[in-house]
């Protein structure tokens, strides 16, 4: 069975990777899809985000990396995917994710959303937090892979 794990991944974190690895044990194919939202300002380009995900998941066989600009439901229909994977860090995530799951179900009744709880050691990590700490020179090595850390340091230092 195929599933999709959509997100902006700006940048990908160990929390994201935890969800990806666990999802690949449940589903035969996991599409990690970088979504583009015109209302969002990104630190990394679409191409950079895709490259980081490819580097971080190269040893996971049943992962497919892709991108999409549009409604998630349209991507699901195009690729015949019926399961959306979402990671939950805390109760506050659940409120938003439940709303999105219900909206997706309304638009496409055969789609189910599977929620995976993030490992507690990653439960406070978000891409926004990682970027903020990096901008102020803090240690982010426990939250992102080395390759991602190097790229983010280059961005924040203007190199």
Curated annotation (Swiss-Prot):
Its main location: cytoplasm. Reversibly transfers an adenylyl group from ATP to 4'-phosphopantetheine, yielding dephospho-CoA (dPCoA) and pyrophosphate. This is Phosphopantetheine adenylyltransferase. Belongs to the bacterial CoaD family. It holds the Pfam family CTP_transf_like. It comes from Thermosipho melanesiensis (strain DSM 12029 / CIP 104789 / BI429). It is found in: Cytoplasm. The record marks 16 as: Transition state stabilizer. NCBIfam families: coaD_prev_kdtB, cyt_tran_rel.
